[in-house]
Amino acid sequence: MRVALLVIGRPRHAGLADAIRDYEGRAAHYWPLDVIEVKEEPGRNLSADVVREREAERLVARLPADAVVVACDPGGVTMDSAQFARWLQEQRESARNVAFVIGGAHGLGPAVRERANRRLSLAPWTLPHEVARMVMAEQLYRAGTIIRGEPYHK
């Protein structure tokens, strides 16, 4: 099983970028991890809807063809860390690749939601997309430690 993490843009804040790289590196010890950074739409004179649509087109174009697509979206299902680890383990046992998609500053466009096999809420709050990326990377790492019975998860 391969895990892809599709995100809009690169982290702008140095401290957050360091934390993201750290957790993505840790997660890669448990799952073959492909981080795919898609160009952010410069939306200075565009509506949020247009920005979402253009970014969604780019994200969908980069999705692995054979992956179970999970849209990270506040309206999705919630799982605690143990449930998330079990779900990932089920995907691994079924030899399914998984692609998690995190939208940009304006969220995910309809094209991503339509392509998604499921929607996952990372929190009931609105998160900056860089923070959502860090949370997703940390949860991938945590899920790996749960599955292996390592002491990180308490």
From Swiss-Prot:
The keyword S-adenosyl-L-methionine applies. Its main location: cytoplasm. S-adenosyl-L-methionine binds at residue 103. CDD domains: RlmH-like (cd18081). Keywords: Cytoplasm, Methyltransferase, rRNA processing, S-adenosyl-L-methionine, Transferase. Specifically methylates the pseudouridine at position 1915 (m3Psi1915) in 23S rRNA. Homodimer. Belongs to the RNA methyltransferase RlmH family. This is Ribosomal RNA large subunit methyltransferase H.
